Amino acid sequence: LLSITTTHIHAFKPLPISFDDFSDLNRSCFAPGFVFGTASSAFQYEGAAFEDGKGPSIWDTFTHKYPEKIKDRTNGDVAIDEYHRYKEDIGIMKDMNLDAYRFSISWPRVLPKGKLSGGVNREGINYYNNLINEVLANGMQPYVTLFHWDVPQALEDEYRGFLGRNIVDDFRDYAELCFKEFGDRVKHWITLNEPWGVSMNAYAYGTFAPGRCSDWLKLNCTGGDSGREPYLAAHYQLLAHAAAARLYKTKYQASQNGIIGITLVSHWFEPASKEKADVDAAKRGLDFMLGWFMHPLTKGRYPESMRYLVRKRLPKFSTEESKELTGSFDFLGLNYYSSYYAAKAPRIPNARPAIQTDSLINATFEHNGKPLGPMAASSWLCIYPQGIRKLLLYVKNHYNNPVIYITENGRNSSTINTVTSRIPF
């Protein structure tokens, strides 16, 4: 977790750092108030998946039912066992001299049935009270994400989770429970983490829970429609965010003195050439990833390119929904990992609709034999450090210069290595 306000981005100039000597790189190189932190999510870290009254999430179901969809066939039953070992983890963070810990609350741990009417799990509430108190006692601030992909299985069973309009009200009620229980100590709230990731991976490719996509794609999904469901899931995530943010701002913000935002992820897209068709393709790449959410959050509507290309498959906001969405965040959490070349892709006549092809771009890591950058350990992660600066400037110039927290970034490696390979990133 890194904090930065884009007002000052224009003044940034890369330092001529020698990677053989990092002795001059320290906190004094950063502006006062810059926040250094680390981040996690409930399903990936907590474990205790079926302990102390917690209900199952769609990820519990997905990893147990389809272990072949997980690279090493693992699940979140134990994870790193933070549920039982959070004091050790926070002690390590303190030793690292961190300022903040960003973690998510497991919706089904506090509401096992997903709804207030299904009962509140006090043991879950107690766990997060203890976690928050431990973070504060060790001199750090909690940055709390309300939703990091773990929809309660009960809501998936009842109305297919984020494909159902009812989730907007249920998420608002869940958020209010968290504001009531933890808002006296939590001053930074994040409603959703990477709604693009949920929409695409869970409903277009079927690689995330609940594993939906069009049958004709032959991706071994549980059913779905890759041309419609990703847009619907994104739409309801946006409305859920707006409902929770509005509630916080009108009912809790004045007394609790906190702020609320949303975390989005985006690649950077470099035009494959100087041709207008490729320049436009790069812009569409940003529209279909970042603008898909930032346009509604700042302008109350989807990007023009999406409205033109997706047409009737793209849901519409009512006048009231548009009003609630516009400006519904105090800060933007931004996650950046990778960049792509973007070139124009031809429209295929009579093609079956799928979000994967709607943007009419061909995104690659190499163009005409020239790689954009070296690859990290993940097949989707191209190491292109300048992409984060370009992305920050793009957000500043196109979306009203919001306050930004860099809530995730970095690269992975298939081997244990020294810090030197990460410094350029």
Curated annotation (Swiss-Prot):
EC number: 3.2.1.21
Key word Disulfide bond present: yes
Recorded catalytic activity of this chain's protein: Hydrolysis of terminal, non-reducing beta-D-glucosyl residues with release of beta-D-glucose
Cysteines joined through disulfide linkages: C213-C221
UniProt: a beta-D-glucoside binding residues: Q44, H148, N193, E194, Y337, E408
Cleaved signal peptide residues: 1-11
Entry keyword set: Disulfide bond, Glycoprotein, Glycosidase, Hydrolase, Signal
SUPFAM superfamilies found in the cross-reference section: (Trans)glycosidases
Expressed in which tissues: Leaves.
GO biological process: carbohydrate metabolic process
Active site: E194 (proton donor), E408 (nucleophile)
Glycosylation sites: N220, N412
GO MF assignments: beta-glucosidase activity
InterPro entries: Glyco_hydro_1 (IPR001360), Glyco_hydro_1_N_CS (IPR033132), Glycoside_hydrolase_SF (IPR017853)
Assembly: Homodimer.
Role played: Hydrolyzes cyanoglucosides, contributing to the release of hydrocyanic acid, which functions as a defense mechanism against small predators, when the leaf tissue is damaged.
Record family assignment: Belongs to the glycosyl hydrolase 1 family.
Protein name as annotated: Cyanogenic beta-glucosidase
Gene that produces this protein: LI
